């Protein structure tokens, strides 16, 4: 388990782009994290004021950050940056709204050199909200 201070040690992201609140569990290849979605999120001001919905691209960013915590916490990757190299099979199944808690799972399925591939999903109340295969490239 990791708290927000430990997450900030691993990730370079800060408010308003830090989208992981807590790590619930982690192994060598899999990590589970949460994001508590509140009405105070800056993106709700414009998406949409009358019906606030978390943008799908930010759900995918939260999943990427979840995977990033796992990799950037490893001694050999400390201080490196990780960049999106691609997304495949992305599906949005459920709207994420203020008051929801996203439970995010990322599982590494392939690592080769500076490239990593992750299967990721985000759930709310046990129901799938979003999923996809994410590809990352590690910078120096």
UniProtKB/Swiss-Prot annotation:
Biological processes, Gene Ontology terms: fatty acid biosynthetic process; lipid A biosynthetic process
EC number: 4.2.1.59
Record: active site: 47
Gene3D superfamilies according to UniProt: Hotdog Thioesterase
NCBIfam families given in the database record: fabZ (TIGR01750), PRK00006.1 (NF000582)
Reactions this protein catalyses: a (3R)-hydroxyacyl-[ACP] = a (2E)-enoyl-[ACP] + H2O
Keyword Lipid biosynthesis: yes
GO MF term list: (3R)-hydroxyacyl-[acyl-carrier-protein] dehydratase activity
Annotated keywords: Cytoplasm, Lipid A biosynthesis, Lipid biosynthesis, Lipid metabolism, Lyase
Family under the similarity heading: Belongs to the thioester dehydratase family. FabZ subfamily.
InterPro entries reported for this sequence: FabA_FabZ, FabZ, HotDog_dom_sf
Cytoplasm among keywords: yes
Function noted in UniProt: Involved in unsaturated fatty acids biosynthesis. Catalyzes the dehydration of short chain beta-hydroxyacyl-ACPs and long chain saturated and unsaturated beta-hydroxyacyl-ACPs.
Main location: cytoplasm
Subcellular location(s) per record: Cytoplasm
Name under which the protein is recorded: 3-hydroxyacyl-[acyl-carrier-protein] dehydratase FabZ
GO CC field: cytoplasm; membrane
């Amino acid at each position: 388990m990791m708290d927000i201070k430990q997450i900030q040690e691993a990730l370079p992201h800060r408010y308003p782009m830090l989208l992981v609140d807590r790590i619930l569990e982690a192994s060598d290849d899999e990590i589970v994290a949460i994001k508590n979605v509140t009405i105070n999120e800056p993106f709700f001001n414009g998406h949409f004021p009358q019906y606030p919905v978390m943008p799908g691209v930010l759900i995918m960013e939260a999943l990427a950050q979840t995977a990033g915590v796992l990799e950037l916490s490893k001694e050999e990757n400390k201080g490196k940056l990780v960049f999106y190299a691609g997304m495949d099979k992305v599906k949005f199944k459920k709207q994420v709204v203020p008051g929801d808690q996203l439970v995010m799972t990322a599982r590494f399925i392939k690592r080769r050199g500076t490239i990593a591939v992750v299967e990721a999903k985000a759930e709310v109340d046990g129901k799938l909200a979003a999923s996809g295969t994410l590809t990352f490239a590690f910078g120096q």
